[in-house]
Amino acid sequence: MVDHLLPVDETFSSPKCSVGYLGDRLASRQPYHMLPSPISEDDSDVSSPCSCASPDSQAFCSCYSAGPGPEAQGSILDFLLSRATLGSGGGSGGIGDSSGPVTWGSWRRASVPVKEEHFCFPEFLSGDTDDVSRPFQPTLEEIEEFLEENMEAEVKEAPENGSRDLETCSQLSAGSHRSHLHPESAGRERCTPPPGGTSGGGAQSAGEGPAHDGPVPVLLQIQPVAVKQEAGTGPASPGQAPESVKVAQLLVNIQGQTFALLPQVVPSSNLNLPSKFVRIAPVPIAAKPIGSGSLGPGPAGLLVGQKFPKNPAAELLKMHKCTFPGCSKMYTKSSHLKAHLRRHTGEKPFACTWPGCGWRFSRSDELSRHRRSHSGVKPYQCPVCEKKFARSDHLSKHIKVHRFPRSSRAVRAIN
């Protein structure tokens, strides 16, 4: 079947196609063009997947396989068996014959691809990468490393900022004068200013500092204060140290006013037990200063401080002053000032509309009170005798009757 197609004296040199090479070609899922083989010119249905042509025809070894599978392996075996049959019949062409005119290298050089395909491979630049502008595409590992480095930097900066704030507060409090607590023998405690200073702790720092447009800061200072035991009390226990109890004195500076929170020592009911707790005043109360700039003695547990001038905005509440000569009254509302000026001018714009009544008043509340005399309405009632009055001042006078009975008043008049 094959001899009549292939002359005996014509030699077919088969390149040595190793099994590994065929496997690589099969593994790469790329379509290749198949050349018609002289073996498949007959009416047989099986076409050879790999054909070796002569150098004149410039053919090459091609593997006709879409992917590794049992069909591809079967086609390779059929091709090998057909080549073995040709080698045994002709005696001149075999798979293992190495005397062919075309060697493996020359066959590789003479191979010409029939089908052109374009592949996009990544370009690896050997030069400097900074010269070429390309988008930055970080990997997940690089992103994680970047986030970890930033978090570590923030954690390191946080304690540094906190320490800076503490240093700033300490510098502000260090420049201020501090009050010292001197307990007395009777158990009372007083707060005295330091020599050469008239203000409490924290007042100097608030006054000397630059004025800010924002909210006024609140400075807190804690000072250790030695509190001795009261006179007449013996040692609490034999093992107790003779040193006194140390508590903290709190200095508060709020809007330019400094307060010192004085501790209050609560004596223990049982002298055999040591006093471990010191109670401080629950509610701070600002005491008025006594004398020129000096702080007077205050009761234990109270908040004693120097009172600074009030805000000038509070003095502007009564800004409407009477301009009549000899009158110095001031009012918070302009309407009240106008009603007051009518008393000086004698103007009475509010007239009673009751028939036959020509009374006029300078204030509207006086007119309302006058109308009750015509209508008979008495909205003010005595809670004791349930007597009603049209005016509130009449009710106030009536209540005095119940406080001082007539009999007692008569007795006092006789005496």
From Swiss-Prot:
Cross-referenced SUPFAM superfamilies: beta-beta-alpha zinc fingers
Classification via PROSITE patterns: ZINC_FINGER_C2H2_1, ZINC_FINGER_C2H2_2
Any matching Pfam family: zf-C2H2
Offer one example of a GO biological process linked to this entry: intracellular glucose homeostasis
Q: Quick one: where's region Disordered?
A: 172-216
Task: Enumerate composition-biased segments (Basic and acidic residues).
Answer: 181-191
Q: Name one GO molecular function term.
A: zinc ion binding
| Residue positions of motif 9aaTAD | 75-83
Q: Does the keyword GTP-binding apply?
A: no
Chain intervals annotated as zinc finger (C2H2-type): 320-344, 350-374, 380-402
Q: What turns on expression?
A: In the heart, up-regulated by the CLOCK/BMAL1 heterodimer. In podocytes, up-regulated by retinoic acid.
**KO phenotype (gene knockout):** KLF15 null mice are viable, but in response to pressure overload, they develop cardiac hypertrophy and fibrosis.
Matches recorded under InterPro entries:
Znf_C2H2_sf, Znf_C2H2_type
Oligomer status and interactors: Interacts with MYOCD. Interacts with EP300.
Q: What does this protein do?
A: Transcriptional regulator that binds to the GA element of the CLCNKA promoter. Binds to the KCNIP2 promoter and regulates KCNIP2 circadian expression in the heart. Is a repressor of CCN2 expression, involved in the control of cardiac fibrosis. Is also involved in the control of cardiac hypertrophy acting through the inhibition of MEF2A, GATA4 and MYOCD activity. Is a negative regulator of TP53 acetylation. Inhibits NF-kappa-B activation through repression of EP300-dependent RELA acetylation. Involved in podocyte differentiation.
Name-wise, this protein is Krueppel-like factor 15
